[in-house]
Amino acid sequence: MRFSPSLEQGRLLRRYKRFLADIELASGEQMTIHCPNTGSMLNCMREGGQVWFSRSNDPKRKLPGTWEISETPQGRLACVNTGRANALVEEALRAGTITELAGFTALKREVAYGEEGSRIDFRLEFEGAPAYVEVKSVTLGYPDTAVAAFPDAVTQRGAKHLRELAKLARQGVRAVQLYCVNLTGIDAVRPAEEIDTAYAQALRAAVADGVEVLAYGTRLDAEGIVIDRRLPVLLTP
């Protein structure tokens, strides 16, 4: 995925009301940009740190800027636009980069399924046998470790998705939880037990029921982002 045009750079002044951030450009101009992330963004931003944003020319938009990448307190780069994860995964699926899911004959997005009113991110067809793939964007890192964690805030919705996947797996349907790690300097992923114990337990229960868990890392900068490697998932606390 290439950013076109390339991202613009600024300095973070503050994030507030979840969806807003004030930044300062190199010229000294201050502007408010949209923050497309509903999570806590724990450890993936710092006031005074560098941010990169895209700019829309749509005159109907109240805020033309969208926050895309953040410098973390650990000096890493994090793609904070959670909407990028699904596009990155689709790109990687179609390119065959995610080898465990290569060879599908059809791909559908946002398909309704399950008993709790869920929508799966991707339904893939493999010679008549479907695979359901749920995508989560990972940006939480900690100092002195190359292991990222998910989630960065309590997520009942995430636990619901795991329950739905587990039900599919128990019925013999292929079900996959895929973590897209949009954070540099990461070698592995784990559930954030210290933040959401229920989610971590739901993940381990889903695996016991037959849900496949995959994690892929990205290479990212102000020019673009690409999924480039498989990462291990550490399930035990």
Swiss-Prot record:
InterPro entries in alphabetical order: SfsA (IPR005224), SfsA_C (IPR040452), SfsA_N (IPR041465)
Top-level taxon in the UniProt lineage: Bacteria
CDD domains, alphabetized: SfsA-like_bacterial
Name by which UniProt lists this protein: Sugar fermentation stimulation protein homolog
Family designation: Belongs to the SfsA family.
One MF term in the entry's GO annotations: DNA binding
Coiled coil ranges: none
Species the sequence originates in: Pseudomonas putida (strain ATCC 47054 / DSM 6125 / CFBP 8728 / NCIMB 11950 / KT2440)
PANTHER family on file: SUGAR FERMENTATION STIMULATION PROTEIN A
